[in-house]
Design a protein with these regions (language model features):
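Alpha-helical transmembrane segments and immediately membrane-proximal extracytoplasmic
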Residues: 1-312
Length: 312
C-alpha cells in the first residue's frame, strides 16, 4: 500500500505502480514468513505469474524482500530488529521415510481435503449473514470464538490462546510439548479451532496461513498416536496438506511444512509432497471452486483471525 501511494504521488506509469506494489508485497510476506524465498513462491503462485511478467516482478520483489530481511537481521554494526524464522528448534530427529508413512501421507491428504472444505463452507454460509447484518453478526462471531476458546480451556486445562489466535506463536509450544496433550484434548482443539477459523473467515480480516498450519499440526499430532506415524512426519504432512487445501498453493505449502522442520525438512519432504498432492487433488474433486476464482482470492477480503486482529 505504501509503495503504491508513493508511486502514484511520483506519477509513475501504471506498470511501474504494479511492480512497486508487488515488490512491497514480497517484502511484507517475506517478513511475515521469515524467509524471502517462501514469500516469493507464495506470491508467484497466488498471482499466477509466468512468462515475461515473472522476471519483471520477481527481480524487484526479491530485492525488496532481501533488503527487508537485512533490516531484521542487521548489517555490520547495525544490530537489526531481531530475526524471525519458521524453523522450530529442539524437535526430535527424523530418519528415513517408511512404507507405512507413505500410506499415512495418503490418509492425511484425504482427511485434510474433508476438513478444509467444511471450514470454507461454514465461512461462506456465515458470510452471507455477515454482509447483510454486519453490526450484529460480527460481534456475535467474536462471542462465538470466545465461547469456543472457553469450552476448550475448561475441558482440557490448556490456554485459550490455542483457539483465540492465529497459531503463529502457539505452533512451537504445541509441537514441543505435544506429549502433554491427550488425544481427546487434540480432537477437541481440532474441532474448536476449525469452527473458530470458519467463523473468523466469515467476519474478520487477517491472513489464512498460520491458522491452516496450526490445524494441520494438531491433526498430525493426534494421528501420531496411532501406529506407524512418527510425530515429526505427522506434523509436517498435516501442515502441508491443510495449507494446500486452504491456500490452493501446492509449492508454497510444501515449503512451509519443510522449512518448519529445519534440518529434518529434506528427509520428510517426500512425505509432505505426497500429502500435499493428495490433499490438493482430493479437495478439487470434493469441493471444486469456480474457475474464475484465483488462488488465494477467497482470503483477499475477509480472512482468518490473526494475533493482532484478535487482540484488537
Amino acid at each position: 500500500m505504501l509503495a503504491t501511494k508513493l508511486a502514484r504521488r511520483r506519477q509513475v506509469p501504471e506498470q511501474g505502480v504494479r511492480v512497486l506494489a508487488a515488490a512491497g508485497s514480497f517484502a511484507a510476506i517475506a517478513t511475515l514468513l521469515g524467509s524471502p524465498l517462501t514469500g516469493a513462491f507464495l506470491l508467484m503462485e497466488a498471482a499466477g505469474l509466468g512468462g515475461p511478467m515473472l522476471g519483471l516482478v520477481l527481480l524487484p520483489g526479491l530485492l525488496a524482500a532481501g533488503i527487508g530481511s537485512l533490516i531484521f537481521i542487521g548489517l555490520d554494526n547495525l544490530t537489526g530488529l531481531g530475526t524471525f524464522s519458521l524453523a522450530l528448534p529442539g524437535l526430535p530427529g527424523f530418519g528415513q521415510p517408511t512404507v507405512a508413512e507413505f500410506g499415512w501421507a495418503i490418509v492425511i491428504g484425504v482427511a485434510a481435503a474433508l476438513v478444509g472444505p467444511g471450514i470454507r463452507w461454514l465461512a461462506r454460509f456465515l458470510q452471507t449473514y455477515a454482509d447483510k447484518w454486519t453490526m450484529i453478526v460480527v460481534p456475535l462471531a467474536g462471542v462465538a470464538v470466545a465461547v469456543l476458546a472457553i469450552i476448550y480451556a475448561e475441558a482440557t486445562g490448556k490456554a485459550t490462546s490455542d483457539v483465540l489466535f492465529s497459531g503463529q506463536n502457539e505452533l512451537d509450544p504445541l509441537i514441543t510439548h505435544a506429549a502433554s496433550y491427550s488425544v481427546g484434548a487434540l480432537v477437541l482443539l481440532l474441532a474448536c479451532k476449525g469452527l473458530a477459523y470458519g467463523v473468523s473467515l466469515s467476519s474478520f480480516r487477517g491472513e489464512p496461513i498460520f491458522p491452516a498450519m496450526f490445524i494441520g499440526a494438531v491433526g498430525g499430532i493426534a494421528l501420531s498416536h496411532l501406529p506407524g506415524l512418527p510425530l515429526i512426519a505427522g506434523v509436517a504432512m498435516g501442515i502441508g496438506a491443510m495449507s494446500v487445501v486452504m491456500l490452493t498453493l501446492p509449492l508454497t505449502s510444501v515449503l512451509l511444512a519443510t522449512l518448519l522442520l529445519a534440518s529434518d525438512g529434506l528427509a520428510v519432504m517426500p512425505l509432505v509432497i505426497v500429502a500435499v498432492v493428495v490433499a490438493h487433488v482430493a479437495a478439487a474433486r470434493i469441493a471444486p471452486r469456480p474457475a474464475a476464482q484465483s488462488a488465494g482470492s477467497e482470503h483477499a477480503g475477509r480472512g482468518a483471525h490473526t494475533d493482532s486482529a484478535a487482540q484488537a
